[in-house]
């Protein structure tokens, strides 16, 4: 969810952080249906680092540039195969579906905040060693460990 704190407007959508070099490099390139927002956390606040390119993008997107205080310094709908640089230095760049700017009613100087959607971690199988010996007795639905007995329902 992304919130325009100044106007009390909310965009209810999936939000992810691009806070590593690889995530920022990948961005939304080659995403066919941009239906979520990506917030780029830049290492330093300046205009050059906040520049974006739209090469290899499959659709147009809305882009909002924020300073380190999360105030809007620039915003626009970015078209494919172009380069964009914000008017002022920026520390955060929000890329999202076209309509994001309109939904939030964004203007320069607005204070923007967000709530990142939690990603569920993938489960990874691991080997676990049990002390002692395990045997199964099917007739009584019992698992027998060498040290104790556990009755299963």
UniProtKB/Swiss-Prot annotation:
It comes from the Archaea. Gene3D superfamilies: Protein of unknown function DUF192 (2.60.120.1140). It holds the Pfam family DUF192. Belongs to the UPF0127 family. NCBIfam families: PRK03760.1. HAMAP family: UPF0127. This is UPF0127 protein TGAM_1372.
């Amino acid at each position: 969810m992304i919130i325009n704190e100044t106007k009390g407007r909310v965009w209810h959508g999936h939000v992810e952080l691009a806070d590593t070099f690889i995530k920022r490099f990948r961005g939304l390139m080659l995403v066919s249906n941009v239906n979520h927002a990506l917030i780029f956390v830049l290492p330093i606040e300046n205009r050059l680092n906040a520049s974006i390119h739209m090469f290899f993008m499959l659709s147009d997107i809305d882009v909002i540039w924020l300073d380190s205080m999360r105030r809007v310094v620039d915003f626009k709908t970015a078209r494919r195969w172009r380069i964009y640089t914000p008017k002022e230095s920026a520390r955060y760049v929000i890329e999202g579906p076209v309509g994001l700017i309109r939904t939030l009613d964004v203007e320069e100087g607005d204070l923007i905040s967000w709530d990142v959607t939690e990603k569920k971690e993938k489960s990874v199988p691991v080997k676990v060693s049990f002390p002692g010996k395990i045997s199964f007795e099917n007739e009584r639905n019992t698992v027998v460990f060498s040290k104790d007995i556990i009755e299963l329902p």
